[in-house]
């Protein structure tokens, strides 16, 4: 009984001595609140820097990223100017951001005919869904900017994925 009591006393003494060390352990790994960087709108689209990308055989629209506008921010956001040309002759230009970690996207501004930008009134991030109407966002997420849900390392990696037609980490079987 004495040896059990003694061992218990030693255990409790060590546990009490170490508890302040372990108490701070969780604090060391607190997750920080994500903070978005201030966004600078890019220059107007340039024809020579437009890179087409494949979305789906189910759409007649054509999709382009302005490679000159492409950035990978320290805040984990891929930003890019997107041009969508419809089969009927419509033209839609937006400056957008994509958060791979959260699988979200956001429109910062819409492009005007004169090349200027009109800031978006909707500032919230929305989930990227692989549905027909927004398939181009899912394609950018899955095939080019966020392979496996992980953000590309830098602009060069994103540009190379767009030029190749897919990210090299996407395995096709």
What name fits each language-model region?
Residues 1-10:
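Bacterial N-terminal signal peptides that target proteins for export
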Residues 11, 22, 172-173:
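Long, low-complexity intrinsically disordered regions enriched in Ser/Thr, Asp/Glu, Pro/Gly
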Residues 18-20:
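N-terminal signal peptide c-region/cleavage motif recognized by signal peptidases
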Residues 24-95:
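N-terminal secretory signal peptides
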Residues 94-104:
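A short, surface-exposed beta-strand/turn
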Residues 102-128:
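A short, surface-exposed interaction/processing loop segment used at functional sites
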Residues 118-173:
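C-terminal partner/receptor-binding element of secreted or periplasmic proteins
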